[in-house]
């Protein structure tokens, strides 16, 4: 395997080089990193992304998605590969052994997302976006984030989604559940009876539709937030993809909560 990769590298003329200019051929192995490259204005450098990235249809997709084989990446002749914490260690090692500049970004928290954005801005010699605050808005309204009005999937401690709720001035009841991405039971929701329900929307739904769904639910119809209409519909991307949208989500969510 290693011999075949080295031979392919030789044929493509891939050799270690000093980084004297911003990268011109970039492969992104994660949707959030693709979003970051676009946000700083360097999208023209992308030569391939994962099938899960929001990118033009004519932009090549990396075979294997977010966990590709090194040969597939090497064949794209990149001068920079952007990888995440889930990129296989073997792939990272092989790419680096072949002299391909490979940067790994950890984005589990809002602070890490901001650090990644600043690092990418430096790499591409772009201006970093203005910082937003991660601090809590200082209120104590309890809330729950649900990935769908009829599911129990939520976000707990140790996730950037939890930090978004905190930045919006909300106390996340799922922080008391087990694990960073818990499945909340109906009894848990009834006992906690959150003041606000935030529904992560993947597109197409509006508040009235989701409220109607919640009010037909045999258990959730009894939640005070449902009876009183204290439901916020918010784009799911901010909670599910730790990228630029997450950094501004706290302020935007707080504004929506204040309208209730």
Which ranges hold each PLM region?
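Structured C-terminal subdomain patch of bacterial secreted/periplasmic proteins
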Residues: 24, 110-125, 138, 203-260
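A short, structured surface patch at a secondary-structure boundary
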Residues: 24-86, 133, 170-173, 220
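Bacterial N-terminal signal peptides
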Residues: 4-15
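Basic- and aromatic-lined ligand-binding clefts that recognize polyanionic substrates
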Residues: 22-37, 123-168
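Short secondary-structure boundary segments
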Residues: 30, 85-86, 147-150, 177, ...
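Proline-aspartate-enriched helix->loop->beta-strand connector
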Residues: 65, 69-86, 100, 185-202
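Boundary at the C-terminal end of the N-terminal hydrophobic targeting segment
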Residues: 18-20
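His/Asp/Glu-enriched short active-site or ligand-binding loop at hydrolase and phosphoryl-transfer sites
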Residues: 50, 158-181, 201
């Amino acid at each position: 395997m290693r011999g075949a990769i080295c031979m392919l590298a030789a044929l493509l003329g891939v050799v270690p080089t000093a980084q004297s200019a911003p990268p011109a051929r970039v492969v992104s192995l994660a949707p959030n990193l693709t979003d970051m490259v676009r946000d700083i204005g360097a999208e023209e450098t992308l030569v391939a992304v994962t099938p899960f990235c929001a990118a033009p249809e004519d932009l090549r997709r990396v075979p294997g998605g977010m966990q590709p084989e090194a040969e597939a990446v090497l064949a794209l002749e990149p001068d920079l590969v952007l990888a995440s914490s889930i990129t296989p260690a073997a792939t990272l090692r092989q790419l680096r052994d072949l002299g391909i500049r490979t940067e790994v970004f950890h984005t589990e928290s809002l602070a890490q997302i901001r650090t990644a954005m600043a690092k990418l801005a430096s790499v591409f010699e772009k201006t970093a976006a203005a910082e937003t605050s991660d601090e809590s808005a200082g209120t104590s309204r309890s809330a729950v984030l649900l990935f769908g009005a009829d599911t129990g999937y939520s976000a707990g401690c140790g996730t950037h989604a939890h930090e978004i709720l905190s930045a919006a001035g909300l106390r996340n009841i799922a922080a008391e559940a087990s694990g960073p991405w818990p499945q909340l039971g109906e009894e848990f929701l009834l006992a906690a009876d959150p003041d606000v329900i935030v529904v992560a929307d993947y597109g197409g739904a509006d508040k009235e539709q989701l409220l109607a769904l919640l009010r037909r639910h045999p258990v959730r119809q009894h939640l005070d937030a449902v009876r009183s209409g204290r439901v916020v519909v918010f784009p799911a991307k901010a909670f599910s993809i730790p990228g630029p949208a997450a950094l501004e989500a706290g302020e935007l969510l707080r504004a929506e909560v204040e309208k209730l």
